[in-house]
């Protein structure tokens, strides 16, 4: 019984140490850093689907997003994805 109890104490201490070590490392580093992250934001304009099925109203880097079969949507812009390699660059 004593050996089993001692073993369980050691296991609990190791688990607690691992948890505390990982909980203390909240720094943003590497590819998960917020400076390297992809950012999505809404543009100032809305968009609509024309009778020809082409979406109108977004300009610049913005594109139209909509829900389901709605003919109205909101313009959105995504930035930061150019910092990541493409599948062609990895080959």
UniProtKB/Swiss-Prot annotation:
Glycan-bearing residues: 46, 69
A molecular function (GO) term: C-X-C chemokine binding
Top-level division of the source organism's lineage: Eukaryota
The keyword Methyltransferase appears for this protein: no
Signal peptide range: 1-23
GO CC annotations on file: extracellular region
Keywords: Disulfide bond, Glycoprotein, Secreted, Signal
Cysteine pairs bridged by disulfides in the record: 43-62, 47-64, 58-75
Subcellular location per the Swiss-Prot or TrEMBL entry: Secreted
Function description: Salivary chemokine-binding protein which binds to host chemokines CXCL1, CXCL2, CXCL3, CXCL5, CXCL6 and CXCL11.
Protein name, as recorded: Evasin P1077
Annotated source species: Ixodes ricinus
């Amino acid at each position: 019984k004593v050996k089993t109890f001692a073993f369980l104490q050691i296991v609990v201490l190791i688990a607690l140490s691992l948890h505390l070590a990982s909980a203390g490392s909240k720094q943003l580093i590497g590819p998960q850093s917020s400076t390297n992250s992809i950012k999505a934001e809404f543009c100032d304009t809305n968009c609509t689907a024309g009778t020809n099925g082409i979406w109108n109203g977004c300009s610049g880097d913005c594109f139209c997003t909509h829900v389901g079969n709605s003919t109205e949507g909101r313009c959105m812009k995504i930035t930061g994805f150019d910092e990541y390699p493409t599948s062609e660059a990895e080959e």
